[in-house]
Regions:
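Extracytoplasmic loops and strand-loop junctions of Gram-negative outer membrane beta-barrel proteins
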Residues: 3-4, 60-63, 80-82, 126-130, ...
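Flexible glycine-rich, low-complexity coil/linker segments exposed to the extracellular/periplasmic environment
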Residues: 182-214, 277-283, 350-356
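Periplasmic N-terminal accessory/gating domains of Gram-negative outer-membrane beta-barrel systems
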Residues: 1-104, 123-130, 139-148, 164-168
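Substrate-binding clefts and substrate-entry loops adjacent to catalytic sites
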Residues: 119-136, 205-210
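Outer-membrane beta-barrel proteins
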Residues: 10, 67, 86, 120-124, 130-134, 166-171, 216-217, 252-256, ...
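Membrane-embedded beta-strands that build the outer-membrane beta-barrel scaffold
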Residues: 37, 47, 81, 100, ...
Length: 356
């Protein structure tokens, strides 16, 4: 399946990801982690841009690096999805081969400016008749492209830049205003009360000088940007060289880890101060369950940096054609936190541990 730039621009895509474009091939399917083809998994296929690998080397999360959107769709000239590849150069994977080619400059000048916007105003405030927390959120993407000649008929350039002002909601749950208020997974209120959360925050601030942050009704800024530059050089009638550089930086906010229960494994036998045995389950009474509530400082940020460089020399020697390609990709995903360093502390109340 071959997809042109015009088709790419006509596809409705909220995430502005290559995965949305890949779904145009009949054998494709969509998973929670990205594109799959021919009944395989999302890890089975290989994605390249100008011949450089654009796969998520980290091993978890999306099939593509940088949160699933490592390159702007406005920088792509065309894409191809090969379900049954036979080229020996396409090896090291079992699924389909997806390759995108970036735009290049020409003797004519071309430029574009684009803007995409969505916010919490586009969401409803009720589910099944119940009010839900509608915290401030924003996703505002602005970008531009420009391409043209540096030396006519000889040297051309293309540049794309994109910036996203992204504000994401924090915890969607709120504390109960009183101990008699209803709580649970079917309402927005969790078990802890406002008085309990405020009391603990005051204790941490006065005793240790540590501010754990907010626990409800807050949002976090997670901006990201993409840049791409490409040069095309017609060296002579027999040799053509193109070099492409791209870099993407995303910044995502995550809830505290729920892979472990606060005091042990999946099911842990605890003993309350009065000697009562308690069965603790991280799914029903863990850090993200309805029986708990966490402060803003318990969240963590996951930065996702992806850099790619590709250079290709096409030569004609007599009746023979030769292509030499060199690519380099680098993926870096450091973690950072809100506020100052402080140990992770889980506070387990006796009536809270059992989820009652």
């Amino acid at each position: 399946t071959n997809i042109s730039s015009r088709q790419i621009q006509s596809i409705p895509s909220v995430s502005r990801s290559m995965n949305d474009v890949m779904l145009l091939t009949p054998q494709a399917s969509s998973t929670t982690s990205g594109f799959a083809v021919g009944g395989g998994t999302y890890r089975g296929s290989s994605v390249t841009v100008d011949g450089a690998a654009f796969n998520n080397a980290f091993g978890i999360g999306q099939n593509l690096p940088a949160g699933g959107s490592p390159i702007s769709l406005d920088a792509i000239e065309q894409m191809s999805i090969n379900v049954t590849r036979f080229d020996g150069s396409q090896s090291g994977f079992q699924g389909g081969a997806i390759n995108a080619v970036t735009k290049s400059g020409s003797n004519e000048w071309h430029a574009s400016v684009y803007d995409y916007y969505t916010s919490e105003a586009f969401r409803g405030s009720k589910v099944a008749g119940e009010d839900v927390t509608n915290t401030k959120s924003l996703n505002h993407t602005i970008g531009a492209t420009i391409g043209g000649p540096i030396v006519k008929n000889k040297l051309f350039f293309f540049v794309n830049g994109e910036y996203t002002f992204d504000t994401v909601p924090g915890s969607s749950s709120v504390a109960r205003t009183s101990a008699s208020e209803q709580w649970g997974s079917d309402v927005s209120a969790n078990y802890p009360t406002v008085a309990q959360m405020d009391q603990m925050k005051e204790f941490l601030t006065s005793k240790f000088g540590y501010d754990p942050g907010r626990y409800q009704g807050y949002s976090l800024d997670t901006p990201d940007y993409k840049i791409l530059a490409r040069l095309d050089w017609n060296i002579n009638d027999n040799n053509r060289l193109n070099v492409r550089f791209s870099h993407t930086h995303t910044y995502g906010s995550n809830q505290p880890s729920s892979s472990m229960s606060p005091l042990g494994g999946t099911n842990t036998a605890l003993v309350a101060p009065d000697g009562t045995a308690i069965s603790f389950n991280r799914y029903s009474a863990g850090r993200q369950a309805a029986s708990a509530l966490y402060y803003e400082a318990a969240r963590y940020f996951q930065e996702q940096n992806f850099t790619s460089v590709a250079a290709e020399l096409n030569s004609r020697i007599g009746k023979a054609n030769n292509m030499a390609r060199v690519t380099w990709s680098h993926q870096d995903e450091p973690r950072s936190y809100v506020g100052s360093f402080f140990p992770t502390v889980d506070i387990l109340a006796q009536d809270n541990a059992s989820g009652n």
